[in-house]
Amino acid sequence: MSAIFGEQLPKSSRVEYIGDVPIIEECPRDVKTLDGEPILLFGKWSYEDVVVRDPGLRRYICLKPVILPHTEGRYQNTRFGKARIPIVERLINLMMRPGRNTGKKHKAYNIVKRAFDLIYYKTGKNPLQVFIDAIINTAPREEITRIIMGGIAYSVSVDVSPQRRLDLALRWITEGARACSFNNPKPIEECLADEIIAAAANDPKSYAVRKREELERIAAASR
């Protein structure tokens, strides 16, 4: 069993292991309705042609077809449960910040739904694919950590795990949308759409792209 901070954590029955190493399987993509029709996100957007071009993130971006991205917290006490939550739901959950938005999931759901409509109107592309491309472009590959040797603290560069890469990308995308909408007449759904479009194009105007470049630059200087 894995030990974190000296504690033995039980293995999850939902996760397969090779020894002590967990195996994260990709979410199923062939889910259909009882009539054999494909399931569309928000009743509009197809999952079938969406491609995750980063092999390292492929197992952690859940693209299981769902109409309503809401799992009711069933994975909250499961190790690596975040990898089984639909990626759009994770975006919705992160839009429920800061504290005054806590619990307002229907509000966050409508923001993301309208943002995806705006992405389609502005790009003509499947907004789900644009969102996945934005995640890949903003997920950092290096960061820094502090180690203490001989009573002196050093910052050293380390590789970022796939799960943390995904966490940081989603966090920065939502932070960028909130920062854009603060004291701005532009609605937050338009800010979120613009942030995702800019990140998908790897545009430096994107808050998330700038944060990734800043972190990787600091990590490169600490090698």
Curated annotation (Swiss-Prot):
Disulfide bonds: none
Cellular compartments per GO CC: cytosolic small ribosomal subunit; ribosome
GO molecular function: mRNA binding; rRNA binding; structural constituent of ribosome
PROSITE patterns per record: RIBOSOMAL_S7
Keywords of this entry: Ribonucleoprotein, Ribosomal protein, RNA-binding, rRNA-binding
Gene3D superfamilies in alphabetical order: Ribosomal protein S7 domain (1.10.455.10)
Matches recorded under CDD domains: uS7_Eukaryote
The keyword Ribosomal protein appears for this protein: yes
Recorded superkingdom: Archaea
Listed GO biological process terms: ribosomal small subunit assembly; translation
Function: One of the primary rRNA binding proteins, it binds directly to 16S rRNA where it nucleates assembly of the head domain of the 30S subunit. Is located at the subunit interface close to the decoding center.
The family this protein is said to belong to: Belongs to the universal ribosomal protein uS7 family.
HAMAP family cross-referenced by the UniProt entry: Ribosomal_uS7_A (MF_00480_A)
Subunit structure: Part of the 30S ribosomal subunit.
Protein name: Small ribosomal subunit protein uS7
Organism phylogeny: Archaea, Thermoproteota, Thermoprotei, Thermoproteales, Thermoproteaceae
